[in-house]
Amino acid sequence: MQDCGGLRLVELPAALVAASPTLFVQHAMATQIALASLPDVSELLRNLLDGPHPAVAGRLAGGFRAIGRQGLADEILGAMRGAGYAVNEVNPIEKPLHALLPGGRAESPCVQRLRLMWAGMREQVVAAFPPASGAPKDIDALVKDVEARYVTDAYHSLSIEGYRVTAALIEKVRDGGWNPDGDDKDRSARDAMAARGYLETHKLVKEDLVRVIKGQNAGTVFRQALLRWVQALFRTSVQAGILKPTDLAGYRNDQVFIRGALHVPPSKEAVRECMPVLFELLEAEAQPQVRAVLGHFLFAYIHPCMDGNGRLARFLMNLMLVPAGHVWTVIPVEGRNEYMSALEQASSLANIAPLASFISELAEAQAEGPLAPPR
């Protein structure tokens, strides 16, 4: 047993030895991730030989071989047979998940789960979206269209996060009428600070859209842009003394929870393992709608920042959609419950279809005409 945050947990090698054959069928992803997470079989062999457990050894050897870890399978068989036990290899895995172990190296369970979710969900996303029209040829016209949708986008994105904003406030901030340096009331206005941060980040996203349209890899652009986006989103809060500059230095340094959700984001340590893999997945994915939906979902799933994750996820979504020929897509606050439910379905039940359909329908509808401006 080991203590993990106050919980007494069975160590992984012992848990694998105790796992029944049906567990590999009923919880295929979890058991295969467990097999893929072991760096070697030293502790596993101690448990197998101590039993002894020759039948279990045959099952685990078959499981390792099924996910591509032939070396570990052979080690188990060799050690057990060398100790005098008759071992028959049996594969307990009905459907190997082949996104595991790129290059044959062990990775953390969180990283394995990201890869498996991406591989398992992408075809559903492709099926939910109509074909994109391709990179826009008139970049100036595209930027003007994005700017024309800005007030509506900022209103809905900020409202989803609980800020009390109006079109008038967003326009005042955009037009330079908000003066935190010369007006104490403006300096302390939380909603206006959020609107200012959104404006500054939106400007950066527009620049990054152009980089992608001109041929740069969208995943690489996002990798390079994320920290700048975070700093722009919260710079005003630092200037007001609400946040310290070190709060914007990188990923979160504490655990976060999502109100009303079953899903608990990964630990702060796991965030540092997961984010490079998310960037890799975005960089390697050819389909923009997959980058948009799964990028949005997995960014929210990881929740790498202490705040602003929803806004950043929606910026990421549009960074992937717009250069492919889709319009800048606004998620309306009126659809918040459906939106949050779709994210929860994806996070807790591995069902991406509701989120893919939700975003696809919004993108199609807004291609016909933008959402009505907020009153």
Q: Predicted segment positions?
A:
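FIC/Doc superfamily catalytic core
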Residues: 1-375
